[in-house]
C-alpha cells in the first residue's frame, strides 16, 4: 500500500514506506493533540459503550415480549385471508386462536369410550366456559364416527400468550379415567413454536459467542484481544436490541422469532468481521508508528472506507426487503440494517478507542515490532498467501475457468432446490406434541378438523355457496356461525341432515348483510391437497360473488406462499441493481462491478445446488419455505460483496503505485488471512442458528455458512484474483487506471 508520512511534535519516530522500502525518521508537527486529550477521548468512547451495553443488556430478555409468530400478522392487508381476519371480528366478540384437544384411550369394546369416560369428557366444556380469562368458551364434545376419539375445540383469547393458554388447557383436562389427551390445531402448533424459539435469547447467543471466541483465540493467539473484539460485538448487539425493542414496542416494525435469531447472529458476525479488518490495519500501523495513537489514526483512515462501504452495501441490500409484501420480510430489512449500523459504529469507535488505550499490550504475547521494512517484504514473498498469489499470477486464465466450471456444475443443480413451502407439522425438527396430536386427529376425524376454512359471504348468496361447498370433494362438512346455537354454530347443507329438533329453528348470524361459514376440509390443513381445495373454492366462490372471502389456517398458508414467491421475483433484481451501482461508485469502474457481481451470483447458485443435494438426498428434508432462498440470496450477495470490497479496495490502493497485476498480488497476500478469518467467523455464527430446531433456521444456517466459506476461501482467494490477473488494467474500465 502507499503510505503517507506523518510528522510529529516532540519525538522522532520511525515509519516504513513500502514504496521506498526504507524506514524513515520524521519530526512531529507542532500543534499535535496532547496525549492526555487523546486518552480522554478514547476513555470517553469506551465508557459510552459500556453505558450502552448496561442500558441495552437487560433488553436481551425482553425482546421476545414484542415479537409475534402469528402468520396473519405478517400478511399484507390486501390478502384475502387477512381480510377475513378483519371481517370476522364482526362475528366474534374477541380475537382468538383455536386449540383442538383430542382424546383417545377408550376402555370400552374396540377402544370406544365407556359411560364413565363420556361423563368426564362431557363435563370439560363447562370448565372452559368458566375460565373466561383464558378462553372464549369451547365447542361441545365431538365424538368420532368410530367412537374411538373425541375432540373439543377451545378458542384461546388473543390477550393471553398462546403458550399459557395451551398450558391452562392441559391443567383443566387431566388425563383421568385412562384417557390420553393431546393438543393440536393453530394454538398447539403456535405453542410448539414458542418452545422452539425459547433458546433464542440464551442458547443461540451463548453458542455464537463461544464459537467466535474460540476462533479469535486461534486467529490472534492472544488472551486479551479476543475479549476486546467480542465485547465490541456484544456492545453493538446491546445497542441494536435496545433500538429495535422500542421500534417494535411502538408498532413501527413487526418482528418474529426468525427475525430475532437472524439479528443476533448477523450483528455478532458482522461486528466481528469489521473488527478483524480494523485490527489487521491497526497491527500493520503499529509496525510503522511508535505511538499507539498515531497508529490508531492511520488504522482508522485505512479501514474507515472499506468498513463503511461494506456495511453500507449490506444495509442497502437489506433495505431492499422493504419492497416485500410480507411484513416479516419488511421488518428484517430495517431491523438487520439497524444491527449493521451499530456494528459499524462499535468497530469504528469503541474498538479503536479500546485498542488505543491498550496499545501493543492488546496483542500480547506476540507484540507488533516497530521496524517492518524487512517484515513487509518478507510477507510479500513468503507464506501461504504469497504462494497462493504466485500460483494465481502464473496461470490466471486456467484457474478462473476451472473454478467457474466447478461452480457452474453445482449451480446447475440449484433448480432442484424445492422451495414450495413446508407443512406446518414439518416446521419443527424433532418432537412436536401438536404434530402428534394432528396425526391422531386425522386417524379418526376429517383431516381439517379444528382448523376450518372461514368463509364470509353476502347473506343473499348463502344457498348458492352451500350448494357449491356440498358438491366439492375437498369439503367434509360446513357450519354457519349462529349466536342462538349452544355450540355457536349450526350445521348447514348436507351436514344438516338428521339435525336435532333443537337446531331446526336456528338461523345463521347476520352482520352487515354478511354471514360466516366454517368449512372443515377432508385433508389436513397443512397439506398440499388442502391448499389446492382452498384455491379451487376461491375460484369457484368468486364466480358466485366477488365479495366472498375464504380465510383460515390453510388460506393463510396459500397467501403467504404466493406473497413469498412474488417477493423473490421483485426483490432479487432490486438487490442486484442497488449493489451494482454501489460497487461502480466505490471502485470507479463499470466492468469490475459487473464481473464481481456475476461471480457472487454464481457462487450463490452453486451454494443452492449443494444445499439441494444435502437437503434432498442426505437429510431428506420435506422442502423449504420460499423465503429461504430469498434470505440466502440477500445475505450471501450482500455479505459476499463485503469480502469483495475488503479485497478490491486494497487492490485499488496498491494498484495506484505498482499496477493492477502486482496490486492484485499484494492485495491478496495482505488481505487473504483477514478475509478468510472473517469468513470463518461469519460462517460459524450463522451455523449457530442450527441450534434452534426449526427447519427454516437450520436450512438458512447451512446455506449462509457454506456460501460464506465458499465465497471467502475459494472465490476471493482464487476466482476473483485470477480474473483480475487475466484482465489486468482492463478490469477498471472505463477508468484509465492500469
Region annotations inferred by a language model:
Residues 1-66, 134-135, 141, 157-419, ...:
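Membrane-embedded transmembrane helical bundles of large multi-pass transporters/channels
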Residues 68, 77-100, 106-190, 416-623:
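Structured non-transmembrane domains adjacent to transmembrane bundles in polytopic membrane proteins
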Residues 74-76, 409:
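A short acidic, glycine-rich active-site loop
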Amino acid at each position: 500500500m502507499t503510505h503517507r508520512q506523518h510528522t510529529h511534535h516532540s519525538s522522532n519516530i520511525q515509519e516504513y514506506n513500502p514504496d521506498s522500502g526504507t524506514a524513515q525518521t520524521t519530526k512531529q508537527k507542532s500543534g499535535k493533540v496532547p496525549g492526555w486529550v487523546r486518552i480522554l477521548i478514547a476513555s470517553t468512547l469506551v465508557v459510552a459503550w459500556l453505558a450502552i451495553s448496561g442500558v441495552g443488556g437487560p433488553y436481551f430478555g425482553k425482546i421476545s415480549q414484542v415479537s409475534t409468530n402469528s402468520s396473519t400478522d405478517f400478511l399484507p392487508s390486501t390478502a384475502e385471508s387477512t381480510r377475513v381476519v378483519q371481517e370476522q371480528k364482526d362475528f366474534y366478540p374477541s380475537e382468538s386462536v383455536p386449540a383442538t384437544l383430542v382424546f383417545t384411550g377408550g376402555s370400552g369394546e374396540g377402544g370406544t369410550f365407556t359411560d364413565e369416560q363420556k361423563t368426564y369428557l362431557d363435563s370439560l366444556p363447562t370448565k372452559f366456559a368458566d375460565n373466561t380469562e383464558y378462553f372464549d368458551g369451547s365447542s361441545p364434545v365431538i365424538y368420532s364416527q368410530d367412537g374411538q376419539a373425541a375432540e373439543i375445540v377451545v378458542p384461546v383469547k388473543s390477550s393471553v400468550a398462546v403458550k399459557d393458554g395451551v398450558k391452562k388447557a392441559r391443567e383443566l383436562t387431566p388425563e383421568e379415567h385412562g384417557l390420553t389427551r393431546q393438543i393440536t390445531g393453530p394454538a398447539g402448533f403456535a405453542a410448539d413454536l414458542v418452545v422452539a424459539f425459547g433458546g433464542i435469547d440464551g442458547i443461540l447467543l451463548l453458542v455464537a459467542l463461544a464459537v467466535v471466541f474460540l476462533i479469535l483465540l486461534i486467529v490472534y493467539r492472544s488472551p486479551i484481544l479476543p475479549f476486546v473484539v467480542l465485547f465490541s460485538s456484544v456492545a453493538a448487539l446491546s445497542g441494536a436490541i435496545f433500538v429495535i425493542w422500542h421500534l417494535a414496542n411502538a408498532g413501527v416494525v413487526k418482528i418474529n422469532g426468525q427475525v430475532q435469531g437472524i439479528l443476533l447472529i448477523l450483528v455478532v458476525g458482522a461486528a466481528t468481521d469489521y473488527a478483524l479488518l480494523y485490527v489487521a490495519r491497526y497491527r500493520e500501523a503499529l509496525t510503522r508508528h511508535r505511538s499507539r495513537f498515531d497508529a490508531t489514526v492511520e488504522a482508522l483512515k485505512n479501514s474507515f472506507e472499506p468498513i463503511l462501504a461494506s456495511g453500507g452495501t449490506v444495509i442497502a441490500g437489506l433495505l431492499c426487503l422493504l419492497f416485500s409484501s410480507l411484513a416479516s420480510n419488511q421488518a428484517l430489512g430495517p431491523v438487520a440494517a439497524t444491527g449493521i449500523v451499530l456494528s459499524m459504529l462499535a468497530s469504528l469507535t469503541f474498538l479503536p478507542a479500546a485498542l488505543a488505550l491498550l496499545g501493543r499490550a492488546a496483542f500480547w504475547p506476540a507484540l507488533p515490532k516497530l521496524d517492518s521494512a524487512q517484515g513487509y517484504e518478507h510477507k510479500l514473498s513468503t507464506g501461504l498467501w504469497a504462494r497462493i498469489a504466485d500460483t494465481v499470477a502464473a496461470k490466471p486464465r486456467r484457474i478462473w475457468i476451472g473454478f467457474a466450471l466447478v461452480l457452474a456444475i453445482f449451480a446447475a443443480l440449484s433448480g432442484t432446490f424445492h422451495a414450495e413451502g413446508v407443512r406446518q407439522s414439518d416446521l419443527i425438527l424433532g418432537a412436536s406434541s401438536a404434530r402428534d396430536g394432528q396425526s391422531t386427529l386425522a386417524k379418526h376425524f376429517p383431516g381439517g378438523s379444528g382448523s376450518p376454512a372461514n368463509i364470509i359471504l353476502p347473506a343473499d348468496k348463502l344457498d348458492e355457496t352451500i350448494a357449491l361447498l356440498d358438491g366439492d370433494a375437498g369439503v367434509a362438512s360446513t357450519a354457519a356461525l349462529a349466536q342462538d346455537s349452544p355450540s355457536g354454530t349450526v350445521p348447514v347443507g348436507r351436514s344438516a341432515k338428521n339435525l336435532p329438533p333443537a337446531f331446526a329453528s336456528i338461523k345463521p348470524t347476520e352482520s352487515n348483510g354478511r354471514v360466516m361459514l366454517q368449512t372443515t376440509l377432508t385433508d389436513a390443513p397443512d397439506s398440499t391437497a388442502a391448499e389446492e381445495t382452498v384455491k379451487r373454492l376461491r375460484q369457484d366462490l368468486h364466480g358466485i360473488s366477488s365479495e366472498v372471502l375464504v380465510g383460515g389456517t390453510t388460506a393463510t398458508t396459500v397467501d403467504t406462499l404466493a406473497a413469498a414467491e412474488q417477493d423473490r421475483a421483485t426483490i432479487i433484481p432490486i438487490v442486484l441493481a442497488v449493489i451494482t451501482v454501489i460497487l461502480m461508485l466505490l471502485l470507479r469502474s463499470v466492468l469490475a462491478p459487473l464481473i464481481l457481481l456475476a461471480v457472487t451470483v454464481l457462487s450463490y447458485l452453486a451454494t443452492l445446488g449443494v444445499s439441494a443435494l444435502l437437503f434432498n438426498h442426505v437429510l431428506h428434508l420435506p422442502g423449504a419455505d420460499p423465503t429461504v432462498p430469498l434470505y440466502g440470496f440477500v445475505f450471501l450477495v450482500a455479505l459476499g460483496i463485503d469480502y469483495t470490497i475488503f479485497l478490491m479496495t486494497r487492490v485499488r490502493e496498491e494498484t495506484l503505485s505498482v499496477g493492477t497485476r502486482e496490486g492484485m498480488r499484494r492485495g491478496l497476500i495482505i488481505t487473504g488471512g483477514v478475509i478468510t478469518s472473517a469468513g470463518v467467523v461469519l460462517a460459524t455464527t450463522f451455523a449457530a442458528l442450527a441450534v434452534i430446531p426449526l427447519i427454516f433456521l437450520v436450512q438458512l444456517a447451512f446455506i449462509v455458512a457454506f456460501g460464506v466459506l465458499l465465497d471467502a476461501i475459494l472465490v476471493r482467494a482464487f476466482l476473483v484474483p485470477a480474473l483480475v490477473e487475466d484482465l489486468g488494467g482492463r478490469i477498471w474500465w472505463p477508468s484509465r487506471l492500469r
